[in-house]
Swiss-Prot record:
Catalytic activity: ATP + H2O = ADP + phosphate + H(+)
Statement: the UniProt record of this protein carries the keyword Ubl conjugation: no
Annotated organism of origin: Mycoplasma genitalium (strain ATCC 33530 / DSM 19775 / NCTC 10195 / G37)
Pfam families reported for this sequence: Cation_ATPase_C, Cation_ATPase_N, E1-E2_ATPase, Hydrolase
Name of the top EC class for this enzyme: translocase
Family the UniProt entry places it in: Belongs to the cation transport ATPase (P-type) (TC 3.A.3) family. Type II subfamily.
Extracellular side: 63-79, 258-275, 665-687, 750-770, 827-844
GO cellular component, one term: plasma membrane
Keyword check for Cell membrane: yes
Protein's name according to its UniProt entry: Probable cation-transporting P-type ATPase
Biological process terms in GO annotation: monoatomic ion transmembrane transport
Length: 874
């Protein structure tokens, strides 16, 4: 190595000021308080806050009107706005906590800040932190080092760099100091790039770009500029939430005005507050308050499950998008294969033994494996070391005295090793180059070439080895050096392959059963890619494989294997499938993969081999670099969507039924029972806002969690799975008739409760007690029926014909919700707050009405299922 002066400390400081420091700026994390405030941008939340504010106004007016006599009516009026506020804040807190956790898991550590490199400063070779490297520095690197910045080579000594993270090429690149002006920047062999790994030799280069201005940094900027993707379900929920909000706001105004007019203007101060409370109850009934919260909880539980299965989800929404994936564009090396070259076959010529062949390949080798299994060097040479038990090869008795390094022109590597008084010349390299240099194969060349063709036909890489013995060697004798690679004795060859993972074939088969199309995109050779793709079942026809250089963008959808692909071509492939309307997942581990990872619907980065920028660009990180893990994620995504849909159906059931009950109650039953209630000094109200909040939160809360953790019985990975429609296969029809039937039962038993109270001596003297009697029946029927409806959604068969143990968690969740209602209606202090009749045990008729309504609702569902079962519609 020549002596280089390098920069002075003053020059380094000046360079840093002019060109910047050598690190990639991290994207600033959104603080928790801002995440919390962002939850209040939702129109649903704004409407609930407005309802809370108006409830406060009503409470204040009522307080002024009663001279602040805090009877139980006024207490309830003051409790209601606080409960609405508590609901809003709880929802927002849960949402912000989940986003904050996802944000923390998404922040990848920048490995550059922890690395050191060797640099010439003031004529001395010193070690500095990579972040301190500046433009103009002269850097020395050798095998095992990571290139710290982009630069131009000044000196090389058999330097080979692995740049697959940037170019997609899995073979190390031979570096020179000669430039090629016609080549692209990434193809310039006299340039080195930040993040590349030196696998062989050594070199000296001068830094030309650092930090964000390197090739890595330019791609990193596209990652920082990317936006968070919404899942298909989140997009639908955003629209549904807006629809509910505007519909609720419109009905609020209409109901308030009509109710005020119906109540009359004689006692306007009192009547407008009654109308306002009714309108607020309607808004609370319409809006499914738990919509976002329950979906986030389900997503979070699924994310935790996948984390244990080696899939780290960065954003909650990704889990559901996974379930809708139709195309998986996957790398070959390390994802479908083991990312570890292995000797899978060998040929020993004449009397050569496996031990002889293995010993020669280990001696002509510059890789190393330490006692703690730390591997350094070219992956192919490492595979040769791992082929046989080296302890049996007696390698320590051989001493290397000379090496003629491998280069891409000769395609050979030669070493001279000494044992006792013998000098053994060992030559390793390409079989087609090595065979003509051997003098013992003249009559067997054709047979050997046939064997080599068979290996090539299987997509295997072959390496041949030969040797000769000298009894005198002088490395200063140029004539002897020139003759080293002639008159050799052929020993044989080995065939190497990065073999497929055992689980990859099963995962590909699972994809095809699920109508998911796997696409292989690789920087490797077409023949190698084709063999692996056929073995795994990705490729069925030879004309479905194409080289990147021969790719016609109009025919992208016709191919299943793409070989020798550039990053731009990979991006074009992903874009073509997306433009055709497919949901696309992409795997990658290098900087060059970042644009495609961002473009895809679900970007999957390899956790072991993936670089930080690829991890930043991805939506989930596969910590075991295994294709099967992605397939597991898709299955979990499908289950998550199914669970979310069941929760949404239940939420919409109570929203629709609650809205119908409040509307018809106000305008029909309100007129029917108006006289009875007003004569006893009480306004008409089927449900209070607090009752509706309890139904929308507690009724669905326990079953929602239970649905998330309950194993599904459906075969989710058989056939296509669409997340485009929330309701299909008569689910929309069922939702309508169930909601209307539940509304009818609620209004019916509310009316029966009112009639019972009117005719009961203990209750008929108080309008408040009369209203509470009816409200108690309706409250329990609507809530308990919705809780048990979670079980209806689990199976198409009647519940009486299924084993309860299959859905034990949902049973537990539903019964827990019913227990909440029982506590409310039977514990007097709770009943007072939630507007139900106290001392209910004294009124068994009302208890029978409450349970009777629930039994009728569940019974009707069982009858409908039996009818369908009889007609073969299930």
């Amino acid at each position: 190595m020549n002596s280089w002066t390098g920069l002075s400390e003053q020059a380094a400081i000046k360079s840093r000021q002019e060109h910047g420091a050598n690190f990639l700026p991290e994207k600033k994390a959104t603080p928790f308080w801002l995440l919390f405030l962002q939850q209040f941008k939702s129109l649903v939340v704004i409407l609930l806050l407005l309802a809370s504010l108006l409830s406060f106004v009503v409470a204040i007016v009522s307080g002024l009107r009663s001279n602040w006599n805090f009877n139980h009516d006024l207490i309830i009026e003051w409790v209601q706005p606080f409960i609405i506020l508590l609901t809003v804040f709880a929802n927002s807190l849960i949402g912000s906590i989940q986003e904050f956790k996802a944000q923390k898991s998404a922040s990848a550590l920048k490995s550059l800040t922890k690395s050191f490199t060797r640099v010439f400063r003031n004529g001395e070779l010193i070690s500095i932190n990579v972040s301190e490297v500046v433009v103009g520095d002269i850097i020395f690197v050798d095998a095992g080092d990571i290139i710290p910045a982009d630069g131009k080579l000044l000196q090389v000594n058999n330097l080979r760099c692995l740049e697959s993270f940037l170019t997609g090429e899995s073979t190390p690149v031979d570096k020179t100091i000669d430039s090629n002006e016609k080549a692209t920047i990434l193809e310039q062999t006299n340039l080195v790039f930040s993040g590349a790994q030196v696998v062989y030799g050594s070199g000296v280069f001068q830094v030309e770009a650092v930090g964000i201005k390197t090739q890595v940094g330019k791609i990193a900027k596209t990652v920082d500029d990317s936006v968070t993707k919404l899942s298909p379900l989140q997009q639908k929920l955003e629209k549904i939430g807006k629809w509910f909000s505007w519909f609720g706001l419109g009905l609020f105004a209409v109901v308030f005005l009509v109710q005020t007019a119906l109540l009359g203007f004689d006692n306007f101060t009192n009547n407008w507050s009654i109308a306002l409370i009714g309108a607020i109850a309607l808004v609370v009934a319409i809006i499914p308050e738990g919509l976002v919260t329950f979906i986030n909880v389900i997503f979070a539980l699924s994310v935790q499950k996948l984390t244990k299965q080696k899939a780290i989800i960065k954003y909650l929404s990704v889990i559901e998008t996974l379930g809708s994936v139709q195309i998986i564009c996957t790398d070959k090396t390390g994802t479908l294969t083991q990312n570890q070259m292995k000797v899978v076959d060998h040929f020993c010529f004449n009397s050569t033994t496996q031990t002889d062949l293995a010993r020669a390949l280990c001696l002509c080798n510059n890789a190393s494996i330490s006692k703690d299994a730390n591997k350094t060097g070219d992956p192919t040479e490492i595979a040769l070391l791992e082929w046989k038990d080296r302890s049996q090869l007696d390698l320590k008795t051989y001493y290397r005295v000379y090496e003629k390094a491998f280069d891409s022109i000769r395609k050979l590597m030669t070493v001279v090793v000494q044992k006792d008084n013998r000098f053994i010349v060992i030559v390793k390299g390409a079989p087609d180059v090595l065979l003509p240099l051997c003098n013992n194969v003249q009559n067997e060349v054709k047979n050997i070439e046939n064997l080599l063709d068979q290996s090539a036909g299987q997509g295997l890489r072959t390496l041949a080895v030969a040797l000769k013995v000298l009894y005198k060697f002088d490395q200063n004798d140029q004539k002897q050096i020139d003759e080293l690679e002639n008159n050799l004795e052929f020993l044989g060859f080995v065939s190497l392959q990065d073999p497929p993972r055992k689980e990859s074939k099963e995962a590909i088969l699972a994809c095809k059963k699920a109508n998911i199309t796997p696409i292989m995109i690789t920087g490797d050779h077409l023949k190698t890619a084709t063999v692996i793709a056929k073995e795994l079942g990705i490729l069925t026809l030879d004309n479905q494989a194409v080289l990147g250089s021969e790719l016609d963008e109009k025919k992208i959808l016709d191919y299943r294997v793409f070989a020798r692909v550039t990053p731009q071509q990979k991006l074009a492939i992903v874009s073509a499938w997306k433009e055709a309307g497919f949901t696309v997942s992409v795997t990658g581990d290098g900087v060059n993969d970042a644009p495609a990872l961002i473009k895809s619907d679900v970007g999957c980065c390899m956790g072991i081999t993936g670089v930080d920028i690829a991890k930043d660009a991805s939506d989930l990180i596969i910590s075991d670099d295994n294709f099967a893990t992605i397939v597991n994620g898709i299955e979990e995504g499908r289950k998550t969507f199914l669970t979310c849909k069941r929760v949404l159906l239940n939420l919409f059931l109570t929203s629709i039924a609650g809205t119908v009950v409040v509307l018809l109650g106000l305008f029909i039953l309100g007129q029917v029972f108006k006289t009875n209630l007003l004569q006893q000094g009480h306004d008409f109200q089927v449900f209070s806002p607090t009752q509706l909040l309890i139904i929308n939160l507690f009724v669905h809360g326990f079953p929602a969690v239970a649905l998330a953790v309950q194993p599904v019985k459906e075969k989710l990975m058989v056939g296509s799975f669409s997340t485009k429609n929330l309701f299909y296969n008569r689910q929309g029809f069922d939702l309508i008739w169930q909601s209307l039937f539940l509304s009818f039962l609620t209004l019916l038993f509310y009316s029966l409760g009112i009639i019972y109270a009117i005719n009961n001596r203990d209750l008929q003297t108080s309008g408040d007690l009369i209203n509470r009697a009816g409200s108690t029946c309706g409250f329990f029927i609507l809530g308990a029926s919705a809780a048990l409806n979670s079980l209806n959604l689990m199976v198409d068969k009647p519940l009486l014909m299924t084993n309860p143990w299959f859905f034990k968690l949902v049973w537990i969740g539903s019964l827990a919700s019913i227990l909440v209602f029982l506590l409310i209606i039977f514990i007097n202090p709770l009943g007072l707050v939630f507007n139900v009749l106290q001392d209910l045990t004294n009124h068994p008729v009302l208890i029978s009405y409450s349970f009777g309504g629930v039994i009728l609702y569940m019974g009707m569902n069982e009858v409908v299922k039996l009818i369908r079962l009889g007609y073969g519609n299930i």
